[in-house]
Amino acid sequence: MQTDSTQAAHELGDASFYLHDYHFRQDNHNGICTLQPQSRQGYGNVYQVQPADGLFLSTGNWIPYASMERKYEINQKLVKIYYLESGSVTLIQNGRKAQTITEGIHLYLNKPSQGRVLYQPNIPISYASVLLFEDYIEKNLQDRFTPDDFDYAEVYDWKAFDYNTPEVGTLFLQIRDKLIAGETSRLYYESKVGELLSIVAGNFHKQRQQIASKQQNLSKSEEKVLESVRQAIEQNVLNPPEVSQLCKIAAMGQTKLRESFKSIY
């Protein structure tokens, strides 16, 4: 069973769940896989493209009519970066405490592992996703670029403020719109994946340098309130709270908040 689910995920990407677990209707046209729930299950569409072996980009906008559960057990390493625009989604992984997936950009690392994803009924699920299996990463990224450009090992150290940014959110919206429009260019999608990883890796290196050099200038209490500000921003990076609200969270004036926040983030 484990081998079957792993193979299905590698061959079909996220579509394996929709096809095998819930038997969504499928239509393949010019390299774009379109999936639709059965009429009794929900309403909407999921689009997926596979530019290369081990690489999948997808977007979905659909409404489940009843609670849905996705069980997975994947015996391969993979990296998934996705932007959840809306939806009530819960992740339960390897017996850990249930985690509610908030709106924004998220990183999922399979090392390998198993778990469940729960979807609540009658709440629109809107997302865009990039899924990379380890064989794609090694062949197309790790073997072609130096660690200064992309270091696979560093992915496991990425933090939310490296990838949950407006720039990354905008990139996912571009991918979403191209998929819906029927774009099939392998060059386009692989270049977008490269751009995505380059942005996040660049943010990671920048943040690491800044934290090392400037964190010593802030007190522990200031670091704590700035972390609260960062979390408030990450709740919706494309429409963050007003500066006045952030000042209240930090109990700082605008100038001090701006300078202190920039010093570590």
What would you call each of these model-derived segments?
Residues M1-H29:
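Short Lys/Arg-enriched alpha/beta "domain-start" segment
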Residues C33-F150:
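N-terminal regulatory/effector-sensing and dimerization cores
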Residues L196-H205, S228, A232-Y265:
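Basic/polar phosphate-binding segments, predominantly the helix-turn-helix DNA-binding elements
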Residues D151-N164, L179-Y188, L197-Q231, Q235:
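Short, Lys/Arg-enriched, Trp-marked, Pro/Gly-tolerant hinge/linker segments that flank
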Residues A52, A181, L238-N239:
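Helix-turn-helix/winged-helix DNA-binding modules
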Residues N140, F145-P147, A153, F161-F172:
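A short mid-domain helix/strand-loop element embedded in enzyme catalytic domains
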